[in-house]
Design a protein with these regions (language model features):
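GAF sensory/regulatory domain recognition
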Residues: 146-152
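Conserved alpha-helical "signature site"
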Residues: 1-145, 156-239
């Protein structure tokens, strides 16, 4: 996923400081889904041999250190070249991803049902398939607006996408998150974030299902609070909200 241009400017400025501050770098990286994904993919790779996968940006930055982070930033800046038109189109996505992530963090802290750092990661990455769909399908944003308009009852946002493209941003986001080596419970939440009603109706007592419900409860509430339906779907009401 292409990184947000202004974030790259701020990160490159920090890396040229005599003593780059890891906390500042982590905060900047946390604002961008593309950079965060590349970071977590790296730190969770077999090279580091971690027994438990990391879902926290700050922990990943602390583990890697400034030199590896700077190399990652430089690599992403090369991959992130986009047309001005694409940058403008994706501004809505970047802004909403950050808002939802911060709201997930707050909700997780207040309720205590989910680790706050993982809730933040889910909020940041849940729509990571959107810019990839847009890159592949120029008409994607128009279809996404139609999808939000038709959502409700038994019709999911992803159903409209499936009819138009034979795939959807939840599926693309799931495989992207897996390629970043995010923990399995986070990738499952990304895959199901427009299938929440079916998940909530499932009375299976498995611990993994309970964890998925908690993640989706935090995420869907954050999406509603941040009006994702208005920003991404161009709708006056949230047809998914019940």
């Amino acid at each position: 996923m292409p990184p947000q241009p202004q974030i790259m400017v701020d990160l490159q400025f920090e890396q040229y400081m005599p003593d780059p501050d890891l906390e500042t770098i982590a905060k900047l990286i946390s604002q961008d889904p593309g950079l965060s994904g590349a970071l977590l993919k790296l730190v969770n790779s077999p090279h580091f041999g971690l027994s438990n996968k990391i879902g926290s940006i700050q922990r990943a930055v602390n583990l890697l250190g400034s030199r590896s982070i700077i190399n990652l930033i430089n690599a992403q800046s090369i991959k992130g070249e986009m047309s001005d038109e694409t940058i403008v189109t994706l501004n809505r996505f970047w802004d909403t991803a950050q808002d939802v992530a911060m709201t997930c963090l707050t909700l997780a802290k207040r309720t205590g049902i989910q680790p706050a750092d993982e809730a933040y990661t889910l909020g940041l990455f849940h729509d990571c398939g959107v810019p990839l769909m847009l890159k592949r399908f120029p008409s994607y944003m128009e279809v996404l607006e139609e999808a939000y308009a038709k959502a409700g009852g038994e019709t999911r946002v992803v159903d409209t996408e499936n009819r138009a493209f034979n795939t959807n941003h939840s599926v693309v986001g799931y495989f992207t998150a897996k390629s970043w080596r995010l923990p399995e419970h986070l990738t499952a939440a990304i895959a199901n974030h427009h299938n929440a009603l079916a998940v909530f109706r499932d009375d299976t007592a498995r611990n993994t299902q309970s964890q998925l419900k908690n993640l989706l409860a935090v995420l869907k509430m954050a999406e509603h609070i941040c009006a994702s339906y208005r920003v991404l779907g161009n709708q006056a009401v949230d047809h998914e909200w019940r």
